[in-house]
Swiss-Prot record:
The keyword Lyase does not apply. The gene is Myh3. It is found in: Cytoplasm, Myofibril. This is Myosin-3. It comes from the Eukaryota. It comes from Mus musculus. Keywords: Actin-binding, ATP-binding, Calmodulin-binding, Coiled coil, Cytoplasm, Methylation, Motor protein, Muscle protein, Myosin, Nucleotide-binding, Thick filament.
Amino acid sequence: MSSDTEMEVFGIAAPFLRKSEKERIEAQNQPFDAKTYCFVVDSKEEYVKGKIKSSQDGKVTVETEDSRTLVVKPEDVYAMNPPKFDKIEDMAMLTHLNEPAVLYNLKDRYTSWMIYTYSGLFCVTVNPYKWLPVYNPEVVDGYRGKKRQEAPPHIFSISDNAYQFMLTDRENQSILITGESGAGKTVNTKRVIQYFATIAATGDLAKKKDSKMKGTLEDQIISANPLLEAFGNAKTVRNDNSSRFGKFIRIHFGTTGKLASADIETYLLEKSRVTFQLKAERSYHIFYQILSNKKPELIELLLITTNPYDYPFISQGEILVASIDDAEELLATDSAIDILGFTPEEKSGLYKLTGAVMHYGNMKFKQKQREEQAEPDGTEVADKTAYLMGLNSSDLLKALCFPRVKVGNEYVTKGQTVDQVHHAVNALSKSVYEKLFLWMVTRINQQLDTKLPRQHFIGVLDIAGFEIFEYNSLEQLCINFTNEKLQQFFNHHMFVLEQEEYKKEGIEWTFIDFGMDLAACIELIEKPMGIFSILEEECMFPKATDTSFKNKLYDQHLGKSNNFQKPKVVKGKAEAHFSLVHYAGTVDYSVSGWLEKNKDPLNETVVGLYQKSSNRLLAHLYATFATTDADGGKKKVAKKKGSSFQTVSALFRENLNKLMSNLRTTHPHFVRCIIPNETKTPGAMEHSLVLHQLRCNGVLEGIRICRKGFPNRILYGDFKQRYRVLNASAIPEGQFIDSKKACEKLLASIDIDHTQYKFGHTKVFFKAGLLGTLEEMRDERLAKLITRTQAVCRGFLMRVEFQKMMQRRESIFCIQYNIRAFMNVKHWPWMKLFFKIKPLLKSAETEKEMATMKEEFQKTKDELAKSEAKRKELEEKLVTLVQEKNDLQLQVQAESENLLDAEERCDQLIKAKFQLEAKIKEVTERAEDEEEINAELTAKKRKLEDECSELKKDIDDLELTLAKVEKEKHATENKVKNLTEELAGLDETIAKLTREKKALQEAHQQTLDDLQAEEDKVNSLSKLKSKLEQQVDDLESSLEQEKKLRVDLERNKRKLEGDLKLAQESILDLENDKQQLDERLKKKDFEYSQLQSKVEDEQTLSLQLQKKIKELQARIEELEEEIEAERATRAKTEKQRSDYARELEELSERLEEAGGVTSTQIELNKKREAEFLKLRRDLEEATLQHEATVATLRKKHADSAAELAEQIDNLQRVKQKLEKEKSEFKLEIDDLSSSVESVSKSKANLEKICRTLEDQLSEARGKNEEMQRSLSELTTQKSRLQTEAGELSRQLEEKESIVSQLSRSKQAFTQQIEELKRQLEEENKAKNALAHALQSSRHDCDLLREQYEEEQEGKAELQRALSKANSEVAQWRTKYETDAIQRTEELEEAKKKLAQRLQDSEEQVEAVNAKCASLEKTKQRLQGEVEDLMVDVERANSLAAALDKKQRNFDKVLAEWKTKCEESQAELEAALKESRSLSTELFKLKNAYEEALDQLETVKRENKNLEQEIADLTEQIAENGKSIHELEKSRKQMELEKADIQMALEEAEAALEHEEAKILRIQLELTQVKSEIDRKIAEKDEEIEQLKRNYQRTVETMQGALDAEVRSRNEAIRLKKKMEGDLNEIEIQLSHANRQAAETIKHLRSVQGQLKDTQLHLDDALRGQEDLKEQLAIVERRANLLQAEVEELRATLEQTERARKLAEQELLDSNERVQLLHTQNTSLIHTKKKLETDLTQLQSEVEDACRDARNAEEKAKKAITDAAMMAEELKKEQDTSAHLERMKKNLEQTVKDLQHRLDEAEQLALKGGKKQIQKLETRIRELEFELEGEQKRNTESVKGLRKYERRVKELTYQSEEDRKNVLRLQDLVDKLQVKVKSYKRQAEEADEQANAHLTKFRKAQHELEEAEERADIAESQVNKLRAKTRDFTSSRMVVHESEE
């Protein structure tokens, strides 16, 4: 996700392309609950957002955003993605992929005006219905060169990706923009073209042609669109600018990616719109643009008004469109015409014909009086139309009303009715407009064809979208059928081809059927007996009607095809005749007028006028139209065979098939356009409409396959070349390694997710997004490498600069040292004296030197003048020599050119041979096609003959029925006469009979009409029959011509015999296949043994599982027994509770009997009773809960037992299947053994053939190798001789120049001797020069002799090699003489045939067709001969096929095993889930039990309070000492009972704990069983994978062997052909070499003769010199004078000689230095390589260290995550401990409250006791005072005392019971405290574990720091080593420079 700064590139378009960073952060911070937030199905909006409130009983309650509450099924609720995925750019990245998620993502982006969204591999765009600033130039620049993931979704991104793919993959691309009508396809097409015209612009304005208005190629491509839209777009119900034609725009690019040219193909222009529009539509834009009066000159030119309602053709619907400005559009259209280079005449004709179409609609006709014929109703409109079309108006009206029709061989004028004339006018208008449109497209293509070299193209497809109107006709069917085919192409490319590619490349893939096959609807329309076929068939019959067409459709398809339905009748809607179920919906079609539309008839008389029109454009449009009244022999030329049957539907299907074939040859990119609503409202989205389009277009399926599959793939070689930079060390240098292995090593060494790619046979496949990651890694790596390289270069440059600075520094030091030394001695006296004397010492010498210098100057001046004269002469000689040299070079060049021409001719002959062979193949293929066509024609002929016979039978039947009718007529007439005579009064019967007569007459007339129609039909069929018979005659004549060429084909028979040899070689291939099959059989035996062992393992595993199940069942029984014991204890405790309750009731009754209880005691008793009732209720609830838990536990145990039983059954079934497979494998092994026996028998037969063929192959290879060696020797000798010849020629030229120079110099010397005797010394000098030249010439002669001898030796060697080659050639010729002769003859004949073809192409085609037919016959005859030889081959192939079939069956078995394993694993996972749910329920039970314990504690506290109160009461009655002993006994008894109850309670708790332990043991055993099963499954998966790999390897080896044999066979054939060609070339080269050798020998002889001549001249010169010596005495004085000059010249000569020697010495020194530098360079290169290896080692060590550091970082991260997890666990434990602490505090608070209540009760009891004691004391005193006197009162007091005693006993008993309860509760409190302590201890242990993890984390962090330190140390070492290497290299450089 790019930042806001990166989005600034797009300018104002940025908010419309991608969310800002602020929005992204806000989305991430939004509150979101994944469990409650959801999408839910809604009846109105399809899907709405909501929150889950509750879920129970299979229903989910959801509250929607608009506060509605919905109760739906769980499957109607869909998960919602987190807010960070809102407005995601690629919907393939969504976490939850479902329909509502995709819908709301598109909706959210659409509301933010982000109309482009990626959907996996393609792009989805939603029509915004308004202008958005997302197509500006800065947006184009922003997308240029960007990868898909680097920029937001856009049509420009798709375009740029297609452009980049074209450049990198060198493959044609296509962009398919599809969608329903009004979805925005045309706009996106324009933007694509705009983008290509911008980024690939040539920028060469100089390419503009003559017209000033014409623009560049980019301008013309862009301008083509407005012109096409003006003439081809119109307003429809759904779209204001709907394309009413389809176009495929191909933009061609050159090798550099620049625009080269473009062309446009159009499909299916909707012609009917010219004359008819619906109410809410209008015609084509151009009519309304012209009428906008923006260009008034057009109104005058076309003779029209500005009111559209004046023209019925264009005013049937709407006139104005709010979103289109017709006036501005007219200017754009006119400008586009100019830019596209239309001439003024063409432009005028374009407008005129458009205006004429409008005028056609105003032409009126009326019916003649008393006739049905039509006549013109006024001629004004016809005059205008004729003027615009360049016609005569009267001729036009006559042709319309009275056209000429051909009847037989004569032409008849036929009268037309008014309706017929109107139909003709409409047809002509549509035809003119259509042809005008097609001409315009052709003219645009001519202009866009720049003839520049072009390599690849990108095609942009824009067709009319899917349409469902109220009235749908043939045009809508064609449009919808085209969209159906394109959708099928998309489905096939996205879902079928993609998965087939995975299978073909050997990638593990389970085929997914997305259910997107549209073949049923397509076949219904285009297959034989489909809709188009029936339509074309009906068009052939003259009396066919739309009704008969409809009836045929119903008979053929209604009820037989699900896609063909009868339409429902809807009131107010146009009548429909049938319905088709398309991919985008069901469409009702009306067949009205389909036959006429399909036949498309024209008034041929008017067309003839068009062809003679003065309007050149109109005449050009109809120049190729064939009419029946064409002149003379033009008929055959103008009209091809069968063109009369070319219907609109047939032409449409042909164009559509061509388009689909074009698309299949390109790499497609899909853009899906979506309509958001039907009202064209910006920003509004109808959910149902958008969902319908998404489902039809396969958007969700495309995303799914993009996520599951591997959408990106690269060839291994390309991947290695492009991404090797990521880790170059992974691929070793200097040794060959397979590209696949290299890619595997490379990817394994990169830090990526290794599950995101797969290796195929030829390509590596990537998941979506991984290739982008690799590209980013590559960019980063390249950036690092470039910066590293820059750093090294800059460092090197700075070091060089530093060395220069050091040299300058040393020089400065030297200068400074000398200057300082001079400054020190400057003022020394002796030095001053030296400065003064030194000039004086040299003054005398200088004078002498000056005099000598003057003399020398004069001498040198004279010598200079002489040398200048000599130099001029030598320059003249040099010019002549250069001219001679150039002449020789021209001769040599001419010879070399001749040689090259000969070689080129040889190459051309070879190429011509190959071309002829290819043409022969093409001809044979075409012959096969012609034979197929011939067979089809004969079948059609037979069919037509059958139909003719049937028609004749029908005619005979009709004649018989006619005769019968005549007889019946006569009979009825006689009856009528008799009845009138006999029954004159019966008028009613007479009337009845007359009515019957009339009916019979009508039937008779009808039969006569039918008979006439059948006769017409028979006539047409007879014409067709005659035509077909003519074709048959032509074919028979061509067959006779083929028989003549049969002699040529007999020669090809020998070629086929050579193919027999190839077939024998294929037998060798089959031998190898047999060996491989043997190996596969062995492998299958081994695999069978492995499977047996696996079956045994499975049996043992099933036995173990059965044992475990039995053990588990025993444990379950034990648990049930324990539960029964628990119930018994519960019953016992319940019984005790009831006893206690009964005793308590008795005590209460006794207390009620006691009368003296105080009010406080009564209140306490009530309070105790209420508390007791509360305790009873709590206890009952606890028992109920306990029983519920026991029931659930029992149920879960039963479920687990049932699951285990099911697992046993599954294992039993698996066992049975394994046994079945075992038996099947045994049968397969038997079959394989039988096949092996048959193969072994065939092997014995094939071995003999194999041996013979191997011997022949080895001989051929040996000879081939010898030939190649000899050829290589000859080529080397040839090259050496050529170089030697060139050297000799150069030396000869030099010698000739020297000789000529010597001769000229000799003549000059003789003249000088005769004329000027004083130049004797110069002659001596010339003599010396001649002597030197003589020596050099002799040396050169020696060299020439040596070279000549070497050349003679080379010639001898060459002759020997030539003789050897000739002998080998003779051998080859004897061996292949017949083949060579045959080939030469074939070549000569092919040349003749080629010349004949070039002269007459039509004759060539016929000859080739005939030849192909005879070829096919001979081929069939020879194939019959070959079949006998191929019996063994077919047998072996059948065996291989059987083995392959068995292998496929085995693969199926393996797949079934895998599915079974997956099912068992799923069942195991379900069992594990159930066990987890059991454990959670057990945990809930524990919580419930703890809550019950809490309630028991509260009850215990209350009992304790009661016990305290009872204790107070006992203290009150303690004064009565008599009952203390009894109370003590009862107390002991109560304690015993309390102990029993306590023991029972402890036993219950122990039983519960025992149950918990057992459950834990069961869970552990379940986990063990799960792990065991997982291990077994993993082992099985590994074994299955091993089997798959073994089979894959065997298949690969077999395929590789087969490919190798095929390659070797092809290589042998190629070598054979190459050797034959090389032999011819060698012969030609030998002849050239012989000629050159003869020429060089002649040249040498001439040179030797010249050398002899020069020798004679030299002898003469010596003799002349001797004569001159005799004359020396005479010229002695002259010699003395000239002696000084000679000496001076000699000195200068010596000086020049010394300079020459010095230069030579310097040259030698420089060569030595070069050698030294070369050696130093090589040593430096070696050291550099060594250092580079060291550096790579160091880099690898650094990378290892970095890897270790990364591993340490990962460990640290892992430790951090572990610490975080432990911290979370600690937090949880702390929370639980805090909860327990809170519970503890609550318990303590309740204890305090109870203690407080107990104190209060004690105080109350004490107060009441004191009062009673005081009363008793007063009573005792009263009794003591009145003891004697009142006996009665004494007895009463004794009774009262006894009552009190009973009451005390009861109270003491109750107090003991309460005390026991209190003690029991106290024990429970103690246990709870123990548990609290244990929880505290667990919390402390958790703290300790957290501390331990923290220490581990600190330790890991410490290790990480140490690893980082080690990495830093390693990096510093690397830097040191680098510094050392730099120092070493710099020192070597310094040493090297010092040596220099």
